Amino acid sequence: MPAHPPHHRRLHLANGLAVALLQDPELPQAAALVRIGAGSHQAPRAYPGLAHFLEHLFFLGSRHYPAADGLMPLVQRLGGELNASTRETTTDFFFALAPEHLGAGLARLLDMLAAPLLAPDAQHREREVLHAEFIAWSRSADTRRDLALATGLPATHPAAGFHAGNRYSLPLNAPAFQAALHDFQRHHYRAANALLVLAGPQPLAELERLAREQGAILPAGPAPRAKAPPPLPATGEGWQTSSAAPATLALQFALDDLPSGSWEAAELLEALLLGEHPGGLPASLRQAGQAERLHLAWPYRQAGQGLLRLEVVPGPQATPAGLTAALFTWLTALRQIPLATLEQGHAARLQRQWATLPALPLVRRLGERLWLDRDGLAWPQPKLSVAAQAAWPQLLAQLVPERLRGFAAGLPAERVTDAAVASPFGLPPANPLLAQPPDRPVPGTQPWPVSLVLAPQQREGLLFLRWQWLGPVPAAPDIAVLGAWPRLAAEAGVNLRWSPPGAPWELRLQGWAPALPATLERTLHQLQGALDAPQAPATAPPEPMLIRQLLKVLPERLPALMPRTGSGGPQWQALACGLPQAAQAALAAVAPPPQPRAAPLGEPPRFSGRHWHHEPSADAQQAVLLFCPQPDTQPTTEAAWRLLVARLQAPLFRRLRTEQQLGYAVFSAYRQLGDQGGLLIGVQSPHARALDILAAIEACLGDSRAAVLAEALGESRQQLVRDFGPTTTQRAALAERLWWGFQRSGALDLAPLREALAALDDEALLQAWTQLTAANAPRVVLANAAVPPGWLS
């Protein structure tokens, strides 16, 4: 655990704005969240989707910042993160940037919420984007499930309503609609109806200064009087069924009249419901043949009400009756255990998870906790509060059949099942990865390659390990061979990622540095058996969004186009980054794999040609990933391409999403894929064909010369040089770049790249643009459309 929890402070500004501040010196980025106490349920019934539509419009210009100088272009230009989310009763806006840019981002965020332009032409363009999202939403299996479960709620309750917007529910030319839109913004986007959360490495005094200066922008005035929602009564167990694929089961409990402290208690409930250990609910459901995987969600939470949903990937014997019988048997056993026993280990797990959250997830989680429990503590404590202890039995008392609604789809009409196997209830065992590692002397030799380029810190170290074959590569085993270790690693603040089926054999550990060596040691033990006896590849669960499906398989498709020749293997390569000395000493005590250590791969073969890979999908929409490899791996080339990609982000997004409304999922980034680095562009569209999407992308690239060269290079150069320095805010990206270069050349020196970045000029940038847009420039397309003429497959 950290020697001291982060410093935090809460205050109220004169205009009524609630503020929460959190300072952690090891946070590489600073982040901000503004939560508004209004969402889709507060929108006028005559205009479903108005709240979500307004969320989109905020990004299209404000009183002091035109759209071209708003929050989104700033974040894109500075390599940060940004998003917004309209929920049932809240709307969130959040971003992360380097600490020195937090003030600039916060000024733009609060200005756009307080004084949006809401220009008519921008409204028309953005409504089409919203309509595209609506089409995708209306066709999804998740929507069918949500609408079916809503039928079990009281008709007068807003959670039972239809709140998605489209071009027909948003009549832009109607004066009444425009009046409602402006009134919604004025009525709800007030300081007293908002929460501002800031987190970063800056001193609390600096965070408070920013909050007071920029928070004063929001208008004062009383918060809108919240209308109490109708009760969520116990109406008896009921099920909706559908024959449509995919196979799914969902259970939803309607919780009502919950006391203060319930949401803190719910954190413990979530951990117990999802605990992947013998005797836990997921293990019990699998043993009974009822569920392969379990996911928990809160579709609705407000004050003393909530909808708790368990989403289930059905097991081989799954039925509604079998699932509910196994669930309620497990819950009955849970109720018999004293709360003090259930709490054991929970605080340690929760505190470790919070201690390793990046800045952006941290402000989001803190904002959620403080919004639901206004009087609660900001940081997890060693035990539940008195209010949470009192709320615990009342929370469990509502997890009963009388409050359950279920949805079943894609299951056989008749299924013969054996009696469910009783699984004894069990509590989570102690997690060995949460234990304080023993002190070790500094080793005389270090068998693992360690880079000192990234500044060491406890909060985030990284370790990469890869096995490689010079000839055909056997399929990587499914992550299931690792047993409980991915879950235990997550509890200890370590994100464990293993190769997806069909991809190269690579292990990545990222997170709490003192726990990395022990996690590596236990994972290696599990993987060694798979190396000795490779297994048939498993089928990965599908991603819910088409573009994410393509991104998931991209890492295995690109290397297949340029395989390295030879035979032999496996051999291993590894690299640790950002570890303090104590973690380095612990790492030295971990025995490396018994296989030989691999030599550097050398420079990759030159990539050429236009390659199209068809990824079959049942989705009616079309999605395209376009990868444009840079011509070589020289530092000067890489530096120019990285700057070029950064300059292209804003014009690509503006042209494809805003002006042409080509799709609602549009992104571009510099990516390292296999042996190649370059520009990756992704678009998903509900109406355009893959070839039309590609043509629009190429046209935008061809027209981008002026936009690429429009800005002075000074700020961009400095930002990129900082990104590849020891104190970078992009720790994972720098570590990945070190790992990429180390595999190729064995070198751990980024000085040549930093020097090339510092020396960039317009001539180098123009040369990179010419390489990208040349008629014979190599291309790789991954799409759910057939290979067109003229492309290699």
Enumerate the language-model features and the residues they cover.
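N- or domain-start disorder-to-order transition segments that initiate the globular core
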Residues: 1-28, 426-460
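An aromatic/glycine/proline-enriched structural segment found at the starts
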Residues: 2, 160, 190-191, 195-250, ...
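Active/ligand-binding-proximal structured segments within catalytic/core domains
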Residues: 16, 23-74, 133, 251, ...
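Non-catalytic accessory/assembly modules
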Residues: 121, 125, 174, 198, ...
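A structural supersecondary motif
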Residues: 248-252, 274-314, 486-499, 625, ...
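C-terminal regions of mature proteins
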Residues: 345-456, 560-590, 717, 722-793
